[in-house]
Amino acid sequence: MAVSESQLKKMMSKYKYRDLTVRQTVNVIAMYKDLKPVLDSYVFNDGSSRELVNLTGTIPVRYRGNIYNIPICLWLLDTYPYNPPICFVKPTSSMTIKTGKHVDANGKIYLPYLHDWKHPRSELLELIQIMIVIFGEEPPVFSRPTVSASYPPYTAAGPPNTSYLPSMPSGISAYPSGYPPNPSGYPGCPYPPAGPYPATTSSQYPSQPPVTTAGPSRDGTISEDTIRASLISAVSDKLRWRMKEEMDGAQAELNALKRTEEDLKKGHQKLEEMVTRLDQEVAEVDKNIELLKKKDEELSSALEKMENQSENNDIDEVIIPTAPLYKQILNLYAEENAIEDTIFYLGEALRRGVIDLDVFLKHVRLLSRKQFQLRALMQKARKTAGLSDLY
């Protein structure tokens, strides 16, 4: 049963880059139906373990004209795709690992592509396609010889009785100086813990060729058309995803630019309104300046005229009310303030002992009565003139 994208997200819930990892895994499963995602415990060299997702199953490899299913297991670290997957060949009981420059005795796979792994240039689908090409040139497993057979055992790595690459010590690859000891943040990567591999009978490798009944060719080479087709497929898939990512990025940038353009248009409209308002205010200010200049000239002329006439003018004649009622109010106000000053100075005279208390009280009583009458009359006159109350 195929695993859905939601199930993958649940399995990879602890992955740092879950959505990206799920997307690449879905692409691989869609192209290679035999690979199934499994959540299992991976044991590192230091004995620590971690729950990781692995892709377990077979990939089709064309060797000498026939297609064989090579069992593999790809462990995806929780920092994928910034760390490469840990890849193993998973031979069945009827198979034997053929050690070489790409596979060690434990079945661990070493490839230049894994060594040079760098996101976003490297991805899982392209890795599998490169494995198919390399395993087509140098198969990582071959079938065990059977004692009861009356014919020489057939091997997937070459003709019968041909010499195989000598077994390499466990953990040693053909790239001694290039591969990092282990992915960043993880201990070493040994062979995964032993566990049952999905049922695969001995007849699956070498499998019955699904596309031809002819026996494998004996020339020991893989056709250039096959390599070219695999590389073209890998490159086209990668270009397709790169183009999609670029298109998505360009669309997001275009949307952001559109929003910025709208904001700029709104800002431009506000600035135009502000400039129009400022122009109106400047025109109003210029008008007020002209008016003030005229008034200033009038005041200067009046002051100059008054200075020339000040020597011949009496101060009492200068202040002349425009109506008799206003003149009466002015006289009443002046007289009332004079009485106020008189009462003040009488108090000062009493304090200094110039006059007696009886004299002070007598004059104050008379002045206060007079002041009251003046205030009452002035209040009535102001009311008649339409002025506000003074007291």
From Swiss-Prot:
Changes after translation: Monoubiquitinated at multiple sites by LRSAM1 and by MGRN1. Ubiquitination inactivates it, possibly by regulating its shuttling between an active membrane-bound protein and an inactive soluble form. Ubiquitination by MGRN1 requires the presence of UBE2D1.
Organism of this sequence: Rattus norvegicus (Rat)
Function: Component of the ESCRT-I complex, a regulator of vesicular trafficking process. Binds to ubiquitinated cargo proteins and is required for the sorting of endocytic ubiquitinated cargos into multivesicular bodies (MVBs). Mediates the association between the ESCRT-0 and ESCRT-I complex. Required for completion of cytokinesis; the function requires CEP55. May be involved in cell growth and differentiation. Acts as a negative growth regulator. Required for the exosomal release of SDCBP, CD63 and syndecan.
Gene for this chain: Tsg101
Name used for this protein in its record: Tumor susceptibility gene 101 protein
Family: Belongs to the ubiquitin-conjugating enzyme family. UEV subfamily.
Coiled coil: 238-317
GO biological process: cell differentiation; cell division; endosome to lysosome transport; exosomal secretion; extracellular transport; keratinocyte differentiation; negative regulation of cell population proliferation; negative regulation of epidermal growth factor receptor signaling pathway
GO terms of molecular function: calcium-dependent protein binding; protein homodimerization activity; protein-containing complex binding; transcription corepressor activity; ubiquitin binding; ubiquitin protein ligase binding; virion binding
Lineage: Eukaryota, Metazoa, Chordata, Craniata, Vertebrata
Positions of short motif PTAP motif: 321-324
